[in-house]
A protein has these predicted regions:
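Outer-membrane beta-barrel "beta-signal"
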Residues: 359-373
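Detector for outer-membrane/organellar transmembrane beta-barrel domains
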Residues: 179-309, 316-317, 328, 365
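Surface-exposed strand-loop-strand hairpins of Gram-negative outer-membrane beta-barrel proteins
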Residues: 58-83, 127
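Transmembrane beta-strands of outer-membrane beta-barrel pores
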Residues: 54-60, 103-107, 166-174, 204-212, ...
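Cleavable N-terminal export/targeting peptides
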Residues: 1-45
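Short loop/turn motifs that connect adjacent beta-strands in outer-membrane beta-barrel proteins
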Residues: 38-48, 89, 94-100, 145-163, ...
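Outer-membrane beta-barrel translocator domains and adjoining extracellular loop/strand segments
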Residues: 62-71, 110-118, 175-179, 213-221, ...
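Surface-exposed loop and membrane-interface regions of Gram-negative outer-membrane beta-barrel proteins
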Residues: 75, 99-179, 298, 341, ...
């Protein structure tokens, strides 16, 4: 809970528990009736924060989607993406809830169906398909031990609280792959305080994912395949349960002079363990660059610099209403795909040699503007 939230909650609790101490007993009360003021109720949500964002990723990627560079000198796996986002955050008596939904609109290097890759239809026929549209939603909820057990024993030094954490994710995209991600997480969160009203959270979790891959569908690029062994009956992939660690932090740059005290830094990182064969078909996996075994995925935004534009131009009363920001993103083994293997996806033959498609590890900058309402 933020400093502001704790201050508001403490003030309201002090009002709710206020008892006039100037009367020794009921016998001292005056003869006439005094109508007591109603005790204000605490709101169910102590904080509600809703925001919309538009941002742009110049060099995003989508694994397995790439085009040849001029002269067949290598592969271009970069995809520019426009991102439209809505986020909701709330604090209630026993914890927090976060929900976010994003729409990513790609350029032509990440095409929609029926193209199977940039500028290519099934059978190798040339075509120009529009950029794909992806929807991704994420939910995280925490339940604080201090609040559940009505204690402060889980706060010590910089440790602010320990919480149960549960979460879910969903994703779908209108490309040929036709992904349909459903993921679930459960574990603990350790919340630490940082200077200048900041925080640092670490959450070890169990992670389970289900997905879909149209390329694995029996009868689709799988002549002579064995259903359930070398092709998927319905294209569904049931990954093994694995481990995950999610980290996020935030801190105002409060050490700056008041005249320029409009900046904050934040970041996040998610580490997700291997979850079995990428296609759910281990009999198809080869060795070396032909392997389809998943690897540990690192999905991170190590640093984001935020400028509080509304505070700078309209004053402290309007802090955080309009912010602009820029961030650096690093995503290794995207979706768990081994960037050193996965022949035909993360690596492919060009000019007689196997070269990286540069689509399974993303290094990009993202810039955006966020409005709170």
């Amino acid at each position: 809970m933020s400093y502001r939230t704790k201050a508001v909650a403490a003030a309201m609790l002090s009002l709710a528990s206020f008892v006039p101490m100037s009367f020794a007993s009921a016998a001292d009360l005056p003869a006439y009736k005094v109508k007591a003021k109603p005790v204000p109720d605490l709101p169910f949500f102590l904080v509600i924060d809703d925001r919309v964002t538009f941002s742009y990723i110049g060099t995003g990627t989508d694994p397995g989607v790439f085009s040849a560079k001029p002269g067949n000198t290598g592969w271009n796996g970069n995809t520019a993406k426009s991102v439209y986002s809505f986020t909701h955050f709330d604090v209630w008596a026993y914890g927090t809830n976060f929900f976010g939904i994003n729409m990513f609109k790609s350029d032509h290097n990440d095409p929609t169906a029926p193209c199977i890759n940039a500028g290519v239809l099934p059978g190798g026929i040339a075509a120009s398909c529009s950029g794909a549209t992806e929807f991704f939603g994420l939910l995280r909820s925490t339940y604080g031990w201090n609040e559940i057990f009505n204690t402060k024993m889980f706060s010590y030094g910089p440790l602010h609280n320990i919480s149960f954490e549960i979460g879910a994710e969903g994703e779908a995209e209108n490309n040929y792959l036709a992904p349909n991600k459903r993921a679930f997480e459960a574990g603990l969160q350790f919340a630490f305080d940082l200077p200048y009203k900041g925080y640092f959270n670490v959450a070890p979790l169990a992670y389970k994912e289900l997905n879909h891959n149209a390329f694995n569908q029996c009868g689709n690029f799988t002549a002579g395949a064995i259903p359930g062994a070398t092709c998927s009956v319905d294209g569904e992939t049931n990954f093994k349960t694995t481990w995950a660690v999610e980290i996020n932090y935030y801190m105002d740059l409060g050490f700056l002079p008041e005249s320029v005290n409009y900046f904050a830094i934040s970041g996040r990182a998610g580490f997700y363990g291997p979850k079995g064969d990428a296609n759910g078909l281990p009999l198809n996996s080869g060795v070396g660059v032909a392997s389809t075994a998943t690897k540990t995925e690192i999905n991170s935004e190590p640093i984001r610099l935020t400028f509080d534009a509304s505070k700078a131009f309209w004053g402290p009363k309007y802090a955080q209403f309009v912010t602009t920001w820029v961030s650096y993103r690093y995503w290794e083994n995207k979706f768990g795909l081994d960037h050193n293997a996965e022949l035909g996806v993360c690596n492919a033959v060009i000019g007689g040699t196997v070269q990286s498609t540069h689509s399974c590890t993303e290094q990009s900058y993202q810039a955006g503007i966020t409005v709170k309402f």
